[in-house]
Design a protein with these regions (language model features):
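Short loop/turn microsegments at loop-to-beta-strand junctions
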Residues: 37-38, 60, 137-139
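N-terminal "domain-start" segment that seeds a small globular fold
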Residues: 22-52
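A short acidic/small-residue loop/turn micro-motif
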Residues: 21, 57-58, 157-159
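Structural microenvironment flanking redox-active thiols in thiol-disulfide oxidoreductases
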Residues: 74-113, 124-130
Length: 192
C-alpha cells in the first residue's frame, strides 16, 4: 500500500505544468518574530559565492524558483521589473534557482524571458528547501536589513504592482508587515 501511495505522489509531481504551490496555502505569512536563516551555499552564474552575507544591511526579497515550475517562471518578469524599480530605494531582489542544472538552467530561462535586471543566483547544493523550510515553489522570503526572515509569500505574486511595491517600501522603511499588505497572486500565463 505504501508503494502505491508513493507512486501516486510521484506521478502528481511529474504532471507537466504543475508547480508545488498548487498543493499549499498561498499568500503572505508574517512571522510573529524575525527568524534567522540557516547557512546555504549560494553561487552566481560564474560559480562565485553570492550568499546572504553579501547583502546584509539592506532588506531583501529572496524568491525560490525552478525552471520546471510554471508559476515560478511566470513570476520572473514581475520580479525583474520590481528589481529595476525598488533596488534604487534600498532593497535587494534575489531570484534563487533551485534547478539541478544550476546556473545553466537559470541563464537559459532568463534569456528566453528576456530578463535584464535579475542576476543569476543558484542554490549550489540544492538544500534551500530544507534549510529554509520551503516545501513548495514558488516561495518568496522577505528579509529585514539584519538578514532575518520577517515574512514569506507562498505562490506566484504580482510583485511589480502597487501592492507589491508598497510591501517592499514598508520592508525598506522597517515598518511592521501585515498579511493584508500582500500583493495579489499572479495570473497564470500560457507560455511563460
Amino acid at each position: 500500500m505504501n508503494r502505491r501511495l508513493f507512486l501516486a505522489a510521484l506521478s502528481a509531481l511529474a504532471i507537466p505544468g504543475q508547480g508545488w504551490a498548487a498543493k499549499a496555502a498561498q499568500g503572505l505569512f508574517v512571522h510573529a518574530a524575525p527568524k534567522p536563516l540557516g547557512d546555504l551555499d549560494i553561487r552566481d552564474n560564474n560559480g562565485q559565492p553570492a550568499g546572504f552575507d553579501t547583502f546584509r544591511g539592506k532588506p531583501a526579497l529572496v524568491n525560490l524558483w525552478a525552471s520546471w515550475c510554471l508559476p515560478c517562471v511566470a513570476e520572473l518578469p514581475a520580479l525583474d521589473r520590481l528589481k529595476a524599480a525598488i533596488e534604487p530605494e534600498g532593497a535587494r531582489i534575489i531570484a534563487l534557482c533551485m534547478d539541478r542544472a544550476g546556473a545553466t538552467s537559470a541563464v537559459n530561462t532568463f534569456a528566453r524571458l528576456k530578463i535584464k535586471n535579475l542576476s543569476v543566483h543558484v542554490d549550489h547544493q540544492r538544500k534551500a528547501g530544507e534549510v529554509f523550510g520551503v516545501p513548495v515553489l514558488p516561495t518568496t522570503l522577505l528579509l529585514n536589513k539584519d538578514g532575518l526572515e520577517v515574512a514569506r509569500f507562498v505562490g506566484p505574486a504580482a510583485w511589480d504592482g502597487p501592492q507589491g511595491m508598497a510591501l517592499m517600501r514598508a520592508l525598506i522603511a522597517d515598518k511592521p508587515l501585515t498579511p493584508d499588505m500582500a500583493p495579489p497572486l499572479a495570473k497564470p500565463t500560457e507560455n511563460p
